[in-house]
UniProtKB/Swiss-Prot annotation:
Gene: SUV39H2
The protein's name: Histone-lysine N-methyltransferase SUV39H2
Family matches, as SMART domains: CHROMO, PostSET, PreSET, SET
Record's catalysed reaction(s): L-lysyl(9)-[histone H3] + 3 S-adenosyl-L-methionine = N(6),N(6),N(6)-trimethyl-L-lysyl(9)-[histone H3] + 3 S-adenosyl-L-homocysteine + 3 H(+)
Keyword ATP-binding among UniProt keywords: no
Residues the record lists as binding Zn(2+) 1: C191, C193, C196, C201
Domain SET: 250-373
Organism: Homo sapiens
This protein's UniProt keywords: Biological rhythms, Cell cycle, Centromere, Chromatin regulator, Chromosome, Differentiation, Metal-binding, Methyltransferase, Nucleus, Phosphoprotein, Repressor, S-adenosyl-L-methionine, Transcription, Transcription regulation, Transferase, Ubl conjugation, Zinc
Length: 410
């Protein structure tokens, strides 16, 4: 891994000084365990199958080339099938082989012949790449769940291609202000209600209606700001006016789409209509900086800029490098999520928090989407996500597939 600056790669990243294999060997030599590199008490002195690399038949006996967990590739060994007690890995090996052959056939290329004695090198190479990909995605999934501060779990899935975790994305739970921008997360007033649902509360002080009904569903029209109770309020965590601040409550899956839209997000549980799903967070930058970055992003065909234009257009949220699950939510011209502006501890109207609520019931397994041209008013904006004048030079084709598709993201 090439050495890079800490600021460029994130404060928690440092250059790799030795290879993973060397590090594993050093751990074993010193009798040290390190879960993050696969060295555990279970396999420190014993062998555990990590994945299967290859297959052959010798004298009517089936053998698999085994990669041992926590051991370098140089220690891989051929083992007879009868010695392997890993049915799930054997099934995965078979599935990967089948998927590779199906992809080759779909591409109208010549299917490598399998004589049932040995695997063609291309098949074995693909199987190893898939195994390494699963390990990388599992580690990424574990990291995401360590960093999140909300109830809902995050899962990662890729059954489409060999794409691994993004190399330049860092999970955050709240806005990250760029140098020179200050976020004051301390409210200037708070309520003293005993029952915020029935009494005059924070929304009334701000001149708007309470956003939620008794079922914690949003009841105000798009374009109306949400004012939740804050840290100065005397109400407790069960207050009916504390919804967005509790974070995502649903288990979500970042998955690889099969139609060329990259990563997407789907819900693993049913979501009721008008329910809070997630926040859109990222790096808060000036609109001038957004203009500069927008030109670069357009040339790469990516779309992560969200203008904070509730009352002014001074700031933009850039989720390209820093963000949460919303970073992976795809666009749709007929979305199932709606944008709302939210104010909690920071009451600066130039810097609303961006919350995504369901517009209808969303079933388990369904992809989550929002309209990249939609702003908090509920209308199509000419200066909302990735659509400022400097970003109009390159138009990105829309692949949402909706009947009402406009053809372009910007």
């Amino acid at each position: 891994m090439a050495a890079v600056g800490a600021e460029a790669r994130g404060a928690w990243c440092v250059p790799c000084l030795v290879s993973l294999d060397t590090l594993q060997e050093l751990c074993r030599k010193e009798k040290l365990t390190c879960k993050s590199i696969g060295i555990t008490k279970r396999n420190l002195n014993n062998y555990e199958v990590e994945y299967l690399c290859d297959y052959k038949v010798v004298k009517d006996m089936e053998y698999y080339l085994v990669k041992w967990k926590g051991w370098p590739d140089s220690t891989n060994t051929w083992e007879p099938l009868q010695n392997l007690k890993c049915p799930l890995l054997l099934q995965q090996f078979s599935n990967d082989k089948h998927n590779y052959l199906s992809q080759v056939k779909k591409g109208k290329a010549i299917t490598p012949k399998d004589n049932n004695k040995t695997l063609k090198p291309a098949i074995a190479e693909y199987i190893v790449k898939k195994a390494k990909q699963r390990i990388a995605l599992q580690r990424w999934q574990d990291e995401l769940n360590r960093r999140k501060n909300h109830k809902g779990m995050i899962f990662v899935e890729n059954t489409v291609d060999l794409e691994g975790p993004p190399s330049d994305f860092y999970y955050i739970n709240e806005y990250k202000p760029a140098p020179g921008i200050s976020l004051v997360n301390e409210a200037t007033f708070g309520c003293s209600c005993t029952d915020c649902f029935f009494q005059k509360c924070c929304p009334a002080e701000a001149g708007v209606l309470l956003a939620y009904n008794k079922n914690q569903q949003i009841k105000i029209p798009p374009g109306t700001p949400i004012y939740e109770c804050n840290s100065r309020c005397q109400c407790g965590p069960d207050c009916p006016n504390r919804i967005v601040q509790k974070g995502t409550q649903y288990s979500l899956c970042i998955f690889r789409t099969s139609n060329g839209r990259g990563w997407g997000v789907k819900t693993l549980v049913k979501i009721k209509r008008m329910s809070f799903v997630m926040e859109y967070v990222g790096e808060v930058i000036t609109s001038e900086e957004a203009e500069r970055r927008g030109q670069f992003y357009d040339n790469k065909g990516i779309t992560y800029l969200f203008d904070l234009d509730y009352e002014s257009d001074e700031f933009t949220v850039d989720a390209a490098r820093y963000g949460n699950v919303s970073h992976f939510v795809n666009h749709s011209c007929d979305p199932n999520l709606q944008v709302f502006n939210v104010f909690i501890d920071n009451l600066d109207t130039r810097l609303p928090r961006i919350a995504l609520f369901s517009t209808r019931t969303i079933n388990a397994g369904e992809e989550l989407t929002f309209d990249y041209q939609m702003k908090g008013s509920g209308d199509i904006s000419s200066d909302s996500i990735d659509h400022s004048p400097a970003k109009k030079r390159v138009r990105t084709v829309c692949k949402c597939g909706a009947v009402t598709c406009r053809g372009y993201l910007n």
